[in-house]
Each structure stands twice: as C-alpha cells, then as structure tokens.
Amino acid sequence: SDLQIQNILSHRIAFISISGKNKISSYKTNINEAQWVAHISAIIYHRITKKESFVPEKHLGIITPYRSQIATIKKELGNTGIIELLSVTIDTVERFQGGQRDVMIFSCCVNAPFQLQFLCNTFKENGQLIDRKLNVALTRAREQMIVIGNSHWLERDTIYRQLIEYIKDKGAFFQI
C-alpha cells in the first residue's frame, strides 16, 4: 500500500523482504523485486517533482547483480508510464563505483542460496569481515538506501544477516 511505502521512505535505510514464489524464468531475474523497484521509483519521482525537476544522475540510481535483472527492471520502469524513469542508471555494483545518487535502490535478486557466492565478496581486514560489493552498494546513497531482496536467503550470509538485523533494530524492515 502507499501508506506502507511512505513508511518505508521515511527511513534512511530500509529493507523490503520479498518472499514467496518468484515467477522464475531464470535465477538471474526476479519479477517481484523489479515491480517493487519500479513502484518505489515512481513514488520517489512524484515526491521529487513536487519540489524540483527530476534529474536522474542526481536523484536516483538502481543496483542489481545481473544484466537480465537490469532488463527486467527497465521493462517495469517503462510500465510506470514515467518517461524520465527510463533515464535512471541501472547497473551492477562494479559498474556503479564512483557514482552517487540521493536515493539508491538495491535489488539483490537472490532466488537460491548458491547465488550468495556471486553476490557476496567478503574478506577480512583488521579482524573485521567486510563485503566489498555490499560496501560499494551502500555507499552510493547520499540520503537514502532501499534494499529489496529475499531475507530468507540473504540471512544465510553473515554480513547480510548483520545488515538485516541492524535494519530490523531501526524499525525499517518490511516483509511483503
């Protein structure tokens, strides 16, 4: 509901857990996540355009690990009917390095546990476990970060579990 989305957008960082059956045409796409990305993008667009012109390079960016999910998200953004959203950069974490946006949406697109190996890039530094890809994804957001994914699978990874627990403690975890 729009009220739920307003609540989601009131947090600096939020996690939307998409559970249930994904209409899987491939493990590298998640239509439910793509639809949520598009819906939230449209609401963010309308919020911004009440105050100023929408500038995609400044206001909004979308990160996802797979090219096929990029295409799925683009299709769903097109379905919103908001032409400006088609100019929003949607790319992989690696290709988004160096670019920041006011709001970043991260579609994790993990449909099975084996995909965590591809999503995660962990190493130890000074006794601390660090995920380079997640770190880059989180630091692209100037004002707000929205993570969309299946928490059931993501929580199998130590760092994602810690992130989800942190977000739950902030009251910004939403089960859809």
Where are these regions (language model features)?
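Helicase-core coupling region on the C-terminal RecA-like lobe
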Residues: 1-43, 99-101, 136-142, 146-176
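Conserved helicase motor "Helicase C" RecA-like lobe of SF1/SF2 P-loop NTPases
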Residues: 43-90
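Amphipathic coiled-coil/heptad-repeat helices and related helical stalk/stem segments
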Residues: 33, 89, 130-133
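Short secondary-structure boundary/capping segments
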Residues: 76-81, 107, 118-124, 154-155, ...
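Short, glycine-/Ser/Thr-/acidic-enriched flexible segments
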Residues: 20-21, 67-69, 95, 110-112, ...
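A short beta-strand element within the Helicase C-terminal
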Residues: 91, 99-111, 116-121, 144-147
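Conserved SF2 helicase motif VI
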Residues: 117-145
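Short acidic low-complexity segments
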Residues: 2-3, 89-96
